[in-house]
């Protein structure tokens, strides 16, 4: 993959001073532009993720029509001299190759690498994080930059000195305390002084900003979207069938209801556009409303092939932005009106959830319970402000005071309501902050109020025992993914495809998406991917194989079956582009869940920085708690481990099962400097 030092051409032939070896600013190592980046990989890499030209993990992988995968640069360089596939020697043209799926890119991005400045920095991170590490966090790269700047300044002053006869002494404080007198880090003390930039732009050396794919792939500063407002953007793609490069969570079978972006993948269409971020909510696709539809329906709509994609999205407000959003006085005046509700008896509930906000005083309607008195009346909306109840002023009141007034009001409840003159978005989430259980931005007013299906009825699991007879050396004929500690997360082993003409394809009972629990009496549920693959291959040598698997079925309502699949996924069990649905993971039994602890810390009494939905009071069912948004500039955001769609199953060791929403939010707020969240993280659906 790389070249040896004797193949390197000196960059500065006439330089009076030797230079530090120029390094690539993406991988931190020395290589030519026509070659791949170099990484110090940690741990074993699955053979399926290795390029069989350079024998290194894939970079910018390309799939050939004959079913093989190689690095973009390796294959391009090979086909400049040859016209056949390196493996099966079938005729091949570079233009017929296409980018591998986002799932493959995601697995490769999560490979662990060691920092190239290992003498002073022993950090191990995911491959996709190395560039940011070198730029922002690595002490070795930082020292190198400081040394370069010092030497460049010294060289400039030497030139000035030769012209003017003056002498300039380096100002104090040029070097950081950790830098020794030579200006180099310990690992570089044997190197000569530098006169080149750390990340050189000299011809012949790697500078990703000027690679042939740079115009499409480089994302410098994301274009900002207005916060707390519904915005419509257009996404353009030259190939209408290429994936968007995002993963999504949510859907009306979960408390999230809306579709939320969990991750934006590098090199994807959305990443190149640069405007959408993780946590943004997608409300419409090409004017089709997906704000209250099932997860797989929304996924199918987003997967429709088109060159121009029109997305209506909502980004949550950060702290304090609402109060100042109309400081110029241009905000429309609130509409104030009366709503009189008649209860059948004094004990009947109105079906209204009331909350306070962090950035405005008073009491606000968070949600209307489906089938409740207020929802049947139809005049109240989420985000309405309650100014008074039966004449009691609540402009600076609390939800608790409002609830007491309603309970004591008898059969007539007269509400004085203020509603923004221009419809504002509203949301069913609560901020796990330091002040109140409020939302910073809300779902659109055209959303059906907070109704979602029971998840247990949407996803079903059926265990099956299968005995397959085969020739002793015949392959089982399936590909699998997952495994404990896998790059996609703590997933069980699951079937990704069943190639035709194989043993299992003839049998017909193992399907794509099945979770493998056991083979020939050997448990697979706690094995890593490589361990499980080795076990499957060893068991395949037997003339008969006994498989125990779990078939996960996502049940769509019969009336919506046709409507909710405008672009049905291929039923071919050998579809290389298939990836599992996020909802599929939610339906797995608890024995297959893998929990991990995330400790958040803060030095001030601000917000933890995430909003939650779910809990016992959602539709009077026991729904899990989901993270809906993560707010920029907060402990959760800077920690980086929490994702939208994560399930919170315990707080400081206390289980959240059966806990109400109104009980969990204050518990989170009461934690002062540290909180331990036990979460289950499932990867979102790729689109």
Swiss-Prot record:
Matching Pfam families: PDZ, zf-C3HC4_2
Motif extent (NPXY motif): 207-210
Entry keyword annotation includes Zinc: yes
Domain PDZ: 232-317, 338-421, 465-551, 597-685
GO-annotated biological processes: neural precursor cell proliferation; neuron differentiation
Segments of skewed composition (Polar residues): 154-167, 424-445
Zinc finger (RING-type): 51-89
Keywords, sorted A to Z: Metal-binding, Repeat, Zinc, Zinc-finger
One GO cellular component term noted in the UniProt record for this chain: plasma membrane
Disordered: annotated span: 145-175, 417-454
Tissue: Widely expressed.
GO molecular function: identical protein binding; PDZ domain binding; zinc ion binding
Domain remark text: The NPXY motif is required for the interaction with the PID domain of NUMB. It is however not sufficient.
Subunit structure: Interacts with the phosphotyrosine interaction domain of NUMB.
The name this protein goes by in its record: Ligand of Numb protein X 2
Organism, scientific name: Mus musculus (Mouse)
Gene for this chain: Lnx2
């Amino acid at each position: 993959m790389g070249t040896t030092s004797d193949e390197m051409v000196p960059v500065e032939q006439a330089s009076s001073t030797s230079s530090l070896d120029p390094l690539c600013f993406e991988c931190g190592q020395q290589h030519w532009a026509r070659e791949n980046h170099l990484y110090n990989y940690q741990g074993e890499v699955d053979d399926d993720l290795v390029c069989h030209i350079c024998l290194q993990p894939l970079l910018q992988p390309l799939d050939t029509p004959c079913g093989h995968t190689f690095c973009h640069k390796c294959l391009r360089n090979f086909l400049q001299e040859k016209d056949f596939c390196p493996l099966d020697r079938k005729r091949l043209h570079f233009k017929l190759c296409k980018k591998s799926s986002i799932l493959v890119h995601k697995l490769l991005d999560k490979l662990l690498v060691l920092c190239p400045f290992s003498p002073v920095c022993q950090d191990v991170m995911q491959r996709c994080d190395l560039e940011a590490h070198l730029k922002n966090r690595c002490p070795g790269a930082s020292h190198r930059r400081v040394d370069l700047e010092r030497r460049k300044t010294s060289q400039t002053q030497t030139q000035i000195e030769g012209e003017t006869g003056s002498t300039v002494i380096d100002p104090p404080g040029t070097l950081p305390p950790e830098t020794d007198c030579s200006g180099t880090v310990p690992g570089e003390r044997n190197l000569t002084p530098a006169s080149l930039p750390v990340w050189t732009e000299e011809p012949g050396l790697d500078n990703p900003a000027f690679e042939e794919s740079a115009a499409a792939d480089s994302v410098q500063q994301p274009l900002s979207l207005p916060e707390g407002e519904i915005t419509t953007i257009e996404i353009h793609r030259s190939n209408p069938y290429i994936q968007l490069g995002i993963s999504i969570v949510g859907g009306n079978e979960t408390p999230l209801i809306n579709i939320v972006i969990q991750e934006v993948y590098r090199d994807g269409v959305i990443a190149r556009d640069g405007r959408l971020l993780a946590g943004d909510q997608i409300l419409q696709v090409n004017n089709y409303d997906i704000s209250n539809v099932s997860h797989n329906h929304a996924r199918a709509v987003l997967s429709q092939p088109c060159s121009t994609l029109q997305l209506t999205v909502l980004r949550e407000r950060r702290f304090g932005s609402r109060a100042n959003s109309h400081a110029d006085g241009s905000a429309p005046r609130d509409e104030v009106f009366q709503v009189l509700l008649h209860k059948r008896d004094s004990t009947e509930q109105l079906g209204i959830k009331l909350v306070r906000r962090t950035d405005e005083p008073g009491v606000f309607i968070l949600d209307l319970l489906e089938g409740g008195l207020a929802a049947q009346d139809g005049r109240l909306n989420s985000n309405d402000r309650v100014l008074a109840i039966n004449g009691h002023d609540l402009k600076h009141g609390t939800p608790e005071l409002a609830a007491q007034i309603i309970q004591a009001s008898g059969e007539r409840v007269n509400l004085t309501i203020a509603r923004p003159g221009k419809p504002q978005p509203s949301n069913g989430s609560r901020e796990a902050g330091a002040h109140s259980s409020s939302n910073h931005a809300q779902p659109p007013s055209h959303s059906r109020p907070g109704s979602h299906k029971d998840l247990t009825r949407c996803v079903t699991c059926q265990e099956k025992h299968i005995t397959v007879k085969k020739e002793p050396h015949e392959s089982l004929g399936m590909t699998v993914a997952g495994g404990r500690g896998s790059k996609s997360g703590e997933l069980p082993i699951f079937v990704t495809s069943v190639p035709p003409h194989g043993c299992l394809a003839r049998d017909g009972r193992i399907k794509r998406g099945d979770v493998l629990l056991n083979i020939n009496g050997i448990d697979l549920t706690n094995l890593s991917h490589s361990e499980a693959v080795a076990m499957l291959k060893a068991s395949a040598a037997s003339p008969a194989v006994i498989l125990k698997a779990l078939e996960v079925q996502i049940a769509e309502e019969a009336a919506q079956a046709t409507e909710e699949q405008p672009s049905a996924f291929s039923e071919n069990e050998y579809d290389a582009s298939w990836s599992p649905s996020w909802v599929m993971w939610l339906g797995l039994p608890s024995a297959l869940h893998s929990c991990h602890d995330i400790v958040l810390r803060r030095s001030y009494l601000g917000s933890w920085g995430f909003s939650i939905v779910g809990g016992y009071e959602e539709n009077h069912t026991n729904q899990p708690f989901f993270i809906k948004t993560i707010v920029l500039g907060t402990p959760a955001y800077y920690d980086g481990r929490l994702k939208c769609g994560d399930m919170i199953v315990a707080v400081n060791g206390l289980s959240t099962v059966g806990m109400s929403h109104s009980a969990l939010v204050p518990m989170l707020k009461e934690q002062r400097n540290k909180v331990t969240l036990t979460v289950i993280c499932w990867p979102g659906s790729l689109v």
